[in-house]
């Protein structure tokens, strides 16, 4: 077996506003695994200032090369060694799965892989000023999305609340589901709870990460008392061992967790999160993290497997149309 690392810099069609700033380019590292004339592709896609393994390019390549050499010799992924490097693990897992299946359809027995059913996805409204976000929101609604996700917490909350009200004036909660993601933009205390109450009056489905991570006492109180369900996202980053995952979920007791394999332990670690969440009746959905079509396809294939082709809620897998060049050879079609 031979494994090659290919750095790629993707260009966004339009600047992508996130809680960590505005992206115009995206650095990724493709994994090309070859064995007996069969090729498997994977994608390592760390996010600057967010991923636990967001290292300098030289550091990242050096470490990734070490792991690929080990896999070439042993034909085994060193899962325990890779726990602190989730984006590397996801890319290596994807390449091995592609190699072993011999197809972009990593799990060919699922209805999704057989093109017999799709995966419902939400329409994501990127950050911007209020006018930009309003236009993007209306476009998603025109495109027929029945689940809209709004990034909030960066602008004036009253203005952000008006966006939610605008949807509710047009559509009831049975017609359009609204999710909001605060990216830690609220402060613990009465002010946070008041905002949650205002969102609850508009039948918001859930809010992701209302306060910044590593405030577990405050977060547990919010999860217990919030009038709308709480979903954890950034809080899961860096929680690597199985015992830590159990402890976090048992203490905080969120209603949902949002899983991004590139950030939350690769597929191996994300499956641990799912197993522990199920024991506590915590629901989950999967979200991509600005991967190209190679990574997005791997996440979608895995999501179909974990969900057994049954979806009680929309997944966050609609980011494949962001890049100028996006590996169109991957047989992945994005629609509402």
Per-range role (PLM):
Residues 8-11, 127, 236, 290, ...:
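Short, solvent-exposed coil/turn elements at secondary-structure transition points
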Residues 99-100, 303-306:
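Generic structural signal for hydrophobic core residues of well-folded globular domains
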Residues 155-303, 322-334:
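Catalytic core of soluble alpha/beta enzymes
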Residues 121, 125, 152, 231, ...:
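Long, contiguous hydrophobic alpha-helical segments, chiefly transmembrane helices and signal peptides
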Residues 28, 227, 254, 312-314:
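Active-site lining segments that contact anionic ligands and/or coordinate catalytic metals
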Residues 1-178, 183-185, 190, 197-200, ...:
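N-terminal capping/lid subdomain adjacent to the active-site entrance of alpha/beta enzymes
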Residues 44, 209, 317:
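Active-site donor-binding loop signature of nucleotide-sugar glycosyltransferases
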Residues 307-321:
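Short helix/strand-capping turn motifs
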């Amino acid at each position: 077996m031979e494994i090659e690392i290919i750095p790629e810099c993707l260009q966004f069609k339009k600047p992508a506003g996130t809680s960590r700033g505005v992206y115009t380019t995206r650095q990724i590292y493709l994994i090309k695994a070859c064995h007996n004339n069969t090729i498997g592709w994977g994608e390592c896609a760390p996010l600057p200032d967010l991923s636990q393994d967001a290292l300098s390019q030289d550091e990242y390549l050096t470490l990734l090369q070490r792991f690929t050499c080990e896999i070439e010799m042993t034909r085994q992924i060193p899962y325990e060694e890779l726990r602190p490097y989730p984006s590397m693990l996801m890319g290596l897992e994807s390449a091995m799965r592609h190699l072993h299946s011999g197809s972009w359809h990593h799990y060919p027995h699922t209805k999704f892989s057989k093109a017999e059913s799709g995966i419902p996805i939400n329409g994501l409204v990127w950050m911007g000023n209020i006018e930009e976000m309003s236009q993007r929101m209306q476009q998603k609604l025109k495109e027929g999305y029945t689940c809209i996700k709004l990034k909030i917490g960066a602008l004036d909350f009253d203005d952000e609340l008006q966006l939610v009200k605008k949807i509710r004036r047009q559509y009831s909660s049975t017609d359009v589901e609204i999710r909001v993601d605060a990216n830690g933009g609220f402060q613990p205390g009465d002010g946070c709870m008041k905002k949650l109450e205002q969102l609850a009056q508009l039948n918001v489905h859930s809010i992701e990460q209302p306060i910044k991570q590593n405030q577990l006492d405050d977060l547990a109180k919010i999860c217990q008392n919030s009038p709308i369900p709480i979903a954890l996202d950034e809080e899961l980053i860096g929680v690597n061992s199985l015992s830590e995952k159990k402890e976090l979920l048992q203490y905080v007791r969120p209603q949902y967790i949002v899983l991004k394999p590139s950030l939350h332990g690769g597929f191996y670690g994300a499956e641990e999160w799912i197993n522990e969440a199920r024991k506590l009746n915590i629901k989950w959905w999967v979200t991509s993290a600005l991967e190209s079509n190679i990574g997005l396809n791997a996440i979608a294939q895995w999501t179909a497997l974990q969900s057994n082709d049954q979806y009680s809620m929309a997944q966050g897998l609609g980011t494949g149309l962001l890049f100028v060049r996006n590996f169109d050879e991957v047989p992945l079609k994005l629609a509402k």
